[in-house]
Amino acid sequence: PLLHLQKSALSRVKDWDRRVHLTPRVIQELEWWQSELQQWNGKSVIPQKHQHILTTDASGLGWGGWWHKVGSRQRKEDEARGFFSRRESKNSSNWRELTAVSLTLRAAAPHLRNQVLLIETDNLVTKAYINHLGGRKPVLSAIARDIWSTAHQFGIQPIAVHRPGKLNQRADKLSRWKQDSTDLQLRPDLFKKADRRWGPHSIDLFANRLNRQTRRYCSWRPDPHSVASDSLLFPLTGENA
């Protein structure tokens, strides 16, 4: 991404010896690299043999993905899926595919600490943006940085590869999942009335990233932003649910 920004600046001044003013976007990019390089200091830049695989896909409806340890049995609980909002669904297919990786990785990361992770995607642009830590389009580069930031937070080393669409059926099915009872929501106006009478409520026990009614929430399956999955096992001491 910095190389693309450099080329863009040089195309305007057409002189390698002239000073170039750093734009806010360039400064933001440099600050991100400074932070991330400190986290990766001393770690190998050569891809190591992966121990886990994470496979994702996206559709116009939603996103989905699953993960497993190499050579182990695939478990249904090791998968995540969700819907795109109406606004999100209008973005390009490349945006949706990269976002599918970002959201699935956030959901899976607590289970994949300190692992070399092979990320399988049927979108070549997604593969390139992850492996190159960005590209020409700022909006896609921002998602790629988010993927790497999540990976660094949990000590994960990601490597993206292309998986042909015809071999990506499980993730594709997850991305096209229709709503079920776990995706239902209490009418917001009724929740507000209940919150005024018995609140404030500290957590929504049955929600996802789009229909949550409190900042903190539990989801039925692994979710990129939930504090826990399976609310029946969540300790409620000190909570007002």
List each language-model region with its residue ranges.
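C-terminal functional segments of enzyme domains
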Residues: 155-198
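C-terminal reverse transcriptase regions that engage the nucleic-acid substrate
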Residues: 1-45, 165
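RNase H catalytic domain
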Residues: 105-173
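Adenosine-cofactor binding site in Rossmann-like domains, unifying the SAM/SAH pocket
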Residues: 44, 84, 178, 195-240
